[in-house]
Every structure is written in structure tokens, then in C-alpha cells.
């Protein structure tokens, strides 16, 4: 499986958010989209998921445009994990997860053994079995994100697109989710994930795409992309980079305002 975007341009009114962006993801690799807030990472992810049309350029899945593939087939080939999610879904968690795998079923009583196994595996992997009879309105932000991850995993899609899946999670669940995403990639799924934590991006992603100033500043292996010079170019501040006990870290240097005497 290969998803490829070529010469993507995205505008907001008269302002160009992204220009001439090329990106591809293949089966078995985990690609991280990183960059400052407002750089267009989520918008690009939505374009890859066929949830937003680009103003220029095209996206193809195995050589076919997403329009030619069609929504029904795309719902089986591409799973999309949105940030936050709708907390007002009234159904139980187990039904919500099943809906990810069976979006076109009117009822879920006729699940096949394969469906049941995929749903159960997804709920176990995302650690939401204990939440199965609750609704989203009664869950914390981190619990909701894990439910949405289970919903995406249940699809068993060729491509998984995840928008900041660890943003609302505690450190333990951040590591568990990132490990789960990497294991999913190792099992043959292409994974694209939007991240702000550069340390997690360096530890878990095979390739990184650094987006800023309307385009791609750099893409490649973490060691190449996460250089102080490139991070400074993207974020507009000098970065301190290093390794502590085998774990990479990336921190902006402290910016101190000038001291002024108060009259």
C-alpha cells in the first residue's frame, strides 16, 4: 500500500497555509508530522484522509485518486483518529468501537467472528475493556482518546492517520499508545501521526516531516530532521538538543524579557 500526495496547496481565504507539499507513506512505516502550532499539520492529515479537498495537487492510493477509490472503500482502507472527538455520542463505548469497523451496518447483531475478534483485540490493545458499558460523556479526555484509538484500530485498515493521539494522555499511556502505533506499523499498516512531543517523535517514528512557514522544512530520519539548525528554522527559537539516559530531548532555550525598572 502506498498513499502519495503531490504538490498539495491549501489556502485560507487569500492566505496560503501550505504550498507545493509532497508526502508519501507506505505499508509498515510510521511517519510523524511535526511543526509549530498553525503550520498546517492537521489540515494536511485531513487532506490525506479525504476529509478536506486541497486547493491544488492530488492524493493517490496505490495510483488511484481518492475520488476514484470512493468513500465506501476508503472507509475500509483508511482509519482516521481525530483529536478530541465528539463527547456527545450517546452510544456505549463498545458500540462506538464497533461502529468504526462496521460503519455501513444498520445493526451490529450480525457481526462475523472476524468482526468480533477485531473489535475485542482493538479494545484490549487500547486498554478500554473496562469502559465498554460507559458513554463518552462520562469519560475523561484521555479515556475518550483511547476509545477513539480502539475505534480506529478495529477497522484493521491499510493506513492509520492519527491527529495528536497522545495530547490528553498521562506519560504512561503516552508511551503505551506510541508503542501500540509502532507495533501497528510493524504489522504492516502505514501510520501517519501528528505530534508535538519531539522526543516521542524521535523515539517511535521511522520518518519525520517537519512543516513550517507554508511548506516542508525537512523530511527524513529523525536524526536528520531534528537538528538544532532545522528546528530553529521551523520554530523560530534556538533549540537545546541532547540525550539523557538514552532518551533524546529537545527544548527551546529560555527567552528572558529585558529587565526594566519600575518608576
Task: List each model region and its residues.
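Helix-to-loop junction immediately C-terminal to a conserved catalytic motif
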Residues: 49
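Conserved ABC ATPase signature
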Residues: 110, 135-139, 143
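The feature captures the beta-strand-to-loop junction immediately N-terminal to the Walker
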Residues: 34-36
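ABC ATPase nucleotide-binding domains
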Residues: 234-263
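Conserved ABC ATPase "signature" region
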Residues: 98, 113-131
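Conserved ABC transporter NBD signature motif
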Residues: 57-65, 74
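Catalytic Walker B motif of ABC-type/P-loop ATPase nucleotide-binding domains
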Residues: 160-164
Amino acid at each position: 500500500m502506498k498513499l502519495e500526495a503531490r504538490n498539495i496547496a491549501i489556502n485560507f481565504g487569500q492566505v496560503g497555509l501550505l504550498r507545493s507539499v509532497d508526502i508519501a507513506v507506505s505499508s509498515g512505516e510510521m511517519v510523524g508530522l511535526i511543526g509549530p502550532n498553525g503550520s498546517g499539520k492537521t489540515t494536511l492529515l485531513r487532506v490525506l484522509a479525504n476529509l478536506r479537498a486541497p486547493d491544488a495537487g492530488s492524493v493517490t492510493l496505490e495510483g488511484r485518486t481518492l475520488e476514484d477509490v470512493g468513500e465506501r472503500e476508503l472507509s475500509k482502507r483508511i482509519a482516521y483518529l481525530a483529536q478530541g472527538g465528539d463527547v456527545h455520542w450517546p452510544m456505549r463505548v463498545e458500540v462506538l468501537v464497533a461502529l468504526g469497523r462496521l460503519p455501513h451496518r444498520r445493526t451490529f447483531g450480525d457481526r462475523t467472528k472476524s468482526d468480533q475478534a477485531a473489535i475485542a483485540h482493538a479494545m484490549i490493545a487500547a486498554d478500554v475493556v473496562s469502559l465498554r458499558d460507559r458513554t463518552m460523556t462520562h469519560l475523561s479526555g484521555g479515556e475518550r482518546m483511547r476509545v477513539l484509538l480502539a475505534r480506529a484500530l478495529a477497522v484493521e485498515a491499510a493506513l492509520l492517520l492519527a491527529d495528536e493521539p497522545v495530547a490528553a494522555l498521562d506519560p504512561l499511556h503516552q508511551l503505551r499508545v506510541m508503542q501500540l502505533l509502532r507495533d501497528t506499523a510493524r504489522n504492516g499498516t502505514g501510520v501517519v501521526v501528528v505530534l508535538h512531543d519531539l522526543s516521542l517523535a524521535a523515539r517511535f517514528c521511522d520518518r519525520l516531516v517537519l512543516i513550517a512557514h507554508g511548506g516542508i522544512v525537512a523530511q527524513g530520519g529523525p536524526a536528520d530532521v531534528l537538528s538544532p539548525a532545522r528546528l530553529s528554522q521551523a520554530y523560530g527559537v534556538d533549540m537545546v538538543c541532547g540525550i539523557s539516559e538514552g532518551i533524546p530531548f529537545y527544548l527551546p532555550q529560555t527567552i528572558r524579557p529585558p529587565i526594566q525598572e519600575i518608576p
